[in-house]
C-alpha cells in the first residue's frame, strides 16, 4: 500500500497494522469515489476564491478530476489496494499529473469532512431511490386497488379466518404504506441535505473558506454550521437513512409474508409468475418462491446495518476511527434493500388472484361481525348482539354473499369506501 497521507518522515509503517487499519475501505470507497471527486472540485473552487490556488491551478485540477472520473467510469482507473482509500487515490493522481497543485488541494480540509461530504451526497441519491421505488410500488397498488375493488378476499387476524375483505382493501393498505415510505425517505433527504465540507477534523481551520460556494456548487440545501456537530452527525445521519430504508423493507417483509402464504398450496389464493420461482435440486415437482423469501429476509440485513451503526455511536464527541465501520454498514444495507425493492413493482403488477380459491375460503362464520353490527343498528346493545352472533356463527352466512358484505362495509377506508381518491392525491403530491 502506498500514498499514506498521514505518514510521518522516518516512521516505518507495519504492513499488518496498516492492513488492519485500512480494512476494506478502499473497496467500499468505490461507492463514494465519484462523489469525492465532485466535492474535491468544489473545494478547489473555494480555495481559488480565497487565493490558495491560482486560476491556472484550478483549471488543471478541474480538468484532471474530470479525467479521473471518466477513467473510473470506464475502468481505466481502478481503486484498489495500492491506495489506502479514495481520498489518497485522488490526491496521488493529482500530484502525479500536476505536481504542487495536487499537493495543495487538501489545504483546509481533512479526510473527516471529505468522507462526510461524499457520504452525504451518496445518501441523498440513495434516499431519492428509496422514495422513487416506494412511489412506484404505491402506484401499482393503487391501480390494482381500483381495478379489483370488489373482488372478495378472506380477511385474517392471527392467521385465522376473520371477516370478508377485498382485494381492493389489501392493495389500498400497501398503497398507503408505501406512500408513507416515500414521504419518510423524502423527509430524511431533507435532514441529510446539509453541507459538512469545510469543517475539517471537527474544529474548523484558520482560513476563510468559501463554504457558501461549496454548499451551492454541490447542491446542498443548507450549510452544516457547527464543525463539532458535523462530526456528531456522522453515523446519526446514516442511521436515519437506514431507518427510512427500513420502513420500506419492513413493509416489503410483510407483503412477502402475505405472498408466501397466499401462494402456498394450502391457500392457493395467488399465482406467482414463473420467473419469480426456482426449482429444487432433488424434488422435480417443486416451484419454490425463493424471490419473495429473499425479499422477506432483506429487512434483516437493513436492521443489522442499523444496529451496527447504533452500537458504533457509543462514543464521546469528536472523530473516532470506530466510525470508519459505518461505511460498510450503509453500503451493504442499501445494496440489499434497494436490490429487493427494485423487484417489487413488477412482481406486484404480475400477480394473479384465483377468485375460485378466494371464494371457497370464505366461510359462514366470517359474516358473524356483520350480523352483530346489524343487530346493534336495530337497537340491540352491541354486547348482547355480539354474544348472540357468536352463538350462531356457524349459520351467520345463511342467505349472505361476500359482495353484499363488502357493499355494506361503508366506514371510510373500508371495502365500500376505499377513498382511493384521497390516497391518489397523496401519491400525486410525491411527484
Curated annotation (Swiss-Prot):
What pathway does this protein act in?
Amino-acid biosynthesis; L-arginine biosynthesis; L-arginine from L-ornithine and carbamoyl phosphate: step 3/3
Q: Which GO terms describe its cellular component?
A: cytosol
Q: What is its EC number?
A: 4.3.2.1
Question: GO MF terms on file?
Answer: argininosuccinate lyase activity
PROSITE patterns given in the database record: FUMARATE_LYASES
User: Which Pfam families does this chain map to?
Assistant: Lyase_1
Q: Which domain of life is it from?
A: Bacteria
Q: Per the annotation, which location comes first and is thus the protein's main one?
A: cytoplasm
Could you tell me what reaction this enzyme catalyses? 2-(N(omega)-L-arginino)succinate = fumarate + L-arginine
What's a BP term from Gene Ontology annotated to this protein?
Answer: arginine biosynthetic process via ornithine
Q: Where is the signal peptide?
A: none
Keyword annotations from UniProtKB, A to Z: Amino-acid biosynthesis, Arginine biosynthesis, Cytoplasm, Lyase
Location(s), subcellular: Cytoplasm
Q: Which family does it belong to?
A: Belongs to the lyase 1 family. Argininosuccinate lyase subfamily.
- Protein's recorded name: Argininosuccinate lyase
Organism, scientific name: Xanthomonas campestris pv. campestris (strain B100)
Amino acid at each position: 500500500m502506498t500514498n499514506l497521507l498521514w505518514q510521518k518522515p522516518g516512521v516505518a509503517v507495519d504492513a499488518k497494522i496498516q492492513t488492519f487499519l485500512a480494512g476494506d475501505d478502499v473497496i467500499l470507497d468505490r461507492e463514494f469515489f465519484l462523489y469525492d471527486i465532485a466535492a474535491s472540485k468544489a473545494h478547489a473552487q473555494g480555495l481559488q476564491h480565497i487565493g490558495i490556488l491560482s486560476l491556472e491551478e484550478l483549471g488543471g485540477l478541474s480538468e484532471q478530476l474530470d479525467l479521473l472520473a471518466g477513467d473510473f467510469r470506464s475502468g481505466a482507473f481502478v481503486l484498489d489496494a495500492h491506495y489506502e482509500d479514495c481520498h489518497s487515490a485522488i490526491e496521488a493522481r493529482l500530484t502525479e499529473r500536476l505536481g504542487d497543485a495536487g499537493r495543495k488541494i487538501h489545504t483546509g480540509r481533512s479526510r473527516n469532512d471529505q468522507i462526510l461530504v461524499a457520504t452525504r451526497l451518496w445518501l441523498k441519491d440513495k434516499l431519492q431511490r428509496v422514495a422513487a421505488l416506494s412511489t412506484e410500488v404505491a402506484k401499482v397498488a393503487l391501480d390494482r386497488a381500483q381495478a379489483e375493488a370488489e373482488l372478495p378476499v378472506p380477511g385474517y387476524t392471527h392467521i385465522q379466518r376473520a371477516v370478508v375483505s377485498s382485494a381492493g382493501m389489501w392493495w389500498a393498505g400497501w398503497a398507503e404504506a408505501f406512500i408513507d415510505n416515500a414521504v419518510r425517505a423524502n423527509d430524511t433527504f431533507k435532514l441529510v441535505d446539509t453541507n459538512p465540507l469545510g469543517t475539517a477534523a471537527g474544529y474548523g481551520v484558520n482560513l476563510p473558506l468559501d463554504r457558501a460556494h461549496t454548499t451551492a456548487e454541490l447542491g446542498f440545501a443548507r450549510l452544516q454550521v457547527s464543525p463539532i456537530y458535523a462530526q456528531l452527525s456522522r453515523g446519526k445521519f446514516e442511521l436515519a437513512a437506514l431507518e427510512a430504508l427500513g420502513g420500506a423493507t419492513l413493509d416489503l417483509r410483510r407483503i412477502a409474508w402475505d405472498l408466501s402464504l397466499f401462494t402456498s398450496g394450502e391457500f392457493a389464493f395467488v399465482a406467482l409468475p414463473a420467473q419469480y420461482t426456482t426449482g429444487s435440486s432433488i424434488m422435480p415437482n417443486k416451484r419454490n418462491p425463493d424471490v419473495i423469501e429473499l425479499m422477506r429476509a432483506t429487512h434483516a440485513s437493513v436492521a443489522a446495518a442499523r444496529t451496527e451503526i447504533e452500537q458504533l455511536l457509543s462514543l464521546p464527541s469528536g472523530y473516532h476511527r470506530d466510525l470508519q465501520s459505518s461505511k460498510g454498514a450503509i453500503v451493504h444495507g442499501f445494496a440489499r434493500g434497494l436490490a429487493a425493492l427494485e423487484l417489487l413493482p413488477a412482481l406486484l403488477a404480475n400477480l394473479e388472484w384465483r377468485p375460485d380459491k378466494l371464494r371457497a375460503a370464505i366461510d359462514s362464520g366470517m359474516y358473524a361481525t356483520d350480523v352483530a353490527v346489524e343487530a346493534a343498528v336495530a337497537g340491540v346493545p352491541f354486547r348482547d348482539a355480539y354474544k348472540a352472533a357468536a352463538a350462531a356463527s356457524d349459520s351467520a352466512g345463511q342467505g349472505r354473499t361476500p359482495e353484499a358484505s363488502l357493499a355494506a362495509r361503508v366506514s371510510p377506508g373500508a371495502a365500500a369506501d376505499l377513498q382511493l381518491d384521497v390516497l391518489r392525491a397523496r401519491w400525486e403530491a410525491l411527484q
